[in-house]
UniProtKB/Swiss-Prot annotation:
Predominant place of localization: cytoplasm
GO molecular function: uracil DNA N-glycosylase activity
Protein name: Uracil-DNA glycosylase
Signal peptide bounds: none
GO cellular component entries: cytoplasm
Active-site residues, record numbering mapped to chain: 62
Species the sequence originates in: Streptococcus pneumoniae (strain P1031)
Superkingdom of origin organism: Bacteria
Keyword Cell cycle: no
Subcellular location: Cytoplasm
Biological function: Excises uracil residues from the DNA which can arise as a result of misincorporation of dUMP residues by DNA polymerase or due to deamination of cytosine.
Entries under HAMAP family matching the protein: UDG
Pfam families reported in the protein's UniProt record: UDG
Length: 217
């Protein structure tokens, strides 16, 4: 992370010494038990999608908490792992909106400029939201603020009540916010189905002179 295009701008948004606190937190929790994703993948979203490449932000809450699932990108799992229910629903909506994506590893999206950011970057095994409110939210809020300050128009995709609260951080009128219910089985019928976020994002990118995302890659 220190050498990425994000580092200095995120640091400028945070209180003095906050990166040190994050390092201390990670040393502590990874030494005490099983934490996901693997330590080397905690910042994977920022390492895969450089600041100068961001076109779309898809905000998740926290990583998957089962073995082998979390890979540092919101909603994504390796193809060797069955797609969790929320991801199944995302891919079904994509299929209805644009077409079928055969892989449920979303790394190809990240490589095209889709920042797959969780608000909380770590989770204890088997404990959803187990690290919520401890260290990560100021950091990931800073990431959102850095993107908000870009002159280049960006699409923010906010699914569910938690992500939609982050709308307050997106104040730049150049950007587009696409919001709906969360793709989880509990809320998918409350407005996620039929929301067409993928075609809407691409229409906006084309309107603003940017290359659309190949969501099926």
């Amino acid at each position: 992370m220190e050498h990425s295009s994000w580092h200095a701008l995120i640091k400028a948004q945070l209180p003095e010494g906050y990166f040190g606190k994050i390092n201390q937190f990670m040393e502590q929790v990874y030494s005490q038990g099983i934490i996901y994703p693997p330590k080397e993948k905690v910042f994977q979203a920022l390492l895969t999608t450089l600041l100068e490449e961001v076109k779309v932000v898809i905000l998740g809450q926290d990583p998957y908490h089962g073995p082998g699932q979390a890979q540092g990108l919101s909603f994504s799992v390796p193809d060797s792992i069955p797609a969790p229910p929320s991801l199944q629903n995302i891919l079904k909506e994509l299929s209805d909106d644009i077409g079928v994506k055969k892989s449920h590893d979303l790394t190809s999206w990240a490589e095209q400029g889709v920042l797959l950011l969780n608000a909380c970057l770590t989770v204890p095994a088997g404990q959803a939201n187990g690290h919520a409110g401890q260290i990560w939210e100021p950091f990931t809020d800073a990431v959102i603020q850095v993107v908000n300050h870009l002159d280049r128009p960006v699409v923010f995709v906010l699914w569910g009540a938690y992500a939609r609260k982050k709308k307050a951080l997106v104040t730049n009128p150049h950007h587009l916010i696409i919001e709906s219910a969360h793709p989880s089985p509990l809320s998918v019928y409350r407005g996620f189905w039929g929301s067409k976020p993928f075609s809407k994002a691409n229409a906006f990118l084309k309107e603003t002179g940017q290359e659309p995302i190949d969501w099926l890659r």
